[in-house]
Amino acid sequence: MATKIFVLLALLALSVSTTTAVIIPQCSLAPNAIISQFLPPLTPVGFEHPALQAYRLQQALANSILQQPFAQLQQQSSAHLTVQTIAAQQQQQQFLPALSQLALANPVAYLQQQLLASNPLALVNNAAYQQQQLQQVLPMISQVAMANPAAYLQQQQLAYNPLVAANAAAYLRQQQLQQILPALSQLALVNPAAYLHTQLLPFNQLAVTNTAAYLQQQQLLRVNPVVAANPLCAAFLQPRQLLPFNQISLMNPAFSWQQPIVGSAIV
């Protein structure tokens, strides 16, 4: 009998413990849910685990950054672009005097510099830009070299000649003289009289003032065999050849023959 009473008490105690274990958590969560609706959101956070608190703070910070107004970001980017534009204008104003002087001194170099600034490849990689320009010029250079090797070599020497940059007229005169000198040397070997004649030609006033009279005079001098044999006699025999065209010789031949002798005696 006593054992039955003891078993009933034990069963009653177990039933009470199970009911409290199930009911108490349900009753304990209800006040927290109700209180969290009326209290600030930071109040229940204080009862949470520290790791969970840090995670929720990180999420709140990320949401605040993502929810930043787009207009503010756009305003910052426009301000940055404005600063860059002002800096570029200041640099351009600094370089404008130098560019204007370059345009007056060498227009070709100025245009090349303008094209260089507008080429994105030149801004990124100057070596690649120079190689590209060289590839564009190489076909034309190869064609010139195959068609006329002498002109190609002259063009290469022209690029590295300081006389061309300093004085183009003196360079052209020098080139003409170098081209004429071989012909003059051959003429001096073959016909010394003609060579002396070409040397005296720049100093002849008649050839400069009246070319027709000078040519007529030369044709008359060629008829005389003495002049062909000895060009130095041309100065003395030249008036004799022009006697038919001299009015003094027609009026007084004796005085015409005497006049050069008197002149030479005076000299």
Swiss-Prot record:
Keyword rRNA-binding applies: no
Cited function: Major seed storage prolamin.
Keyword Transport: no
Molecular-function GO term, any one: nutrient reservoir activity
Alphabetic keyword roster: Seed storage protein, Signal, Storage protein
Sequence similarity: Belongs to the zein family.
Protein name per UniProt: Kafirin PSKR2
Organism: Sorghum bicolor (Sorghum)
Annotated signal sequence range: 1-21
Taxonomic lineage from the root: Eukaryota, Viridiplantae, Streptophyta, Embryophyta, Tracheophyta
Coiled-coil stretches: none
Entries under Pfam families matching the protein: Zein (PF01559)
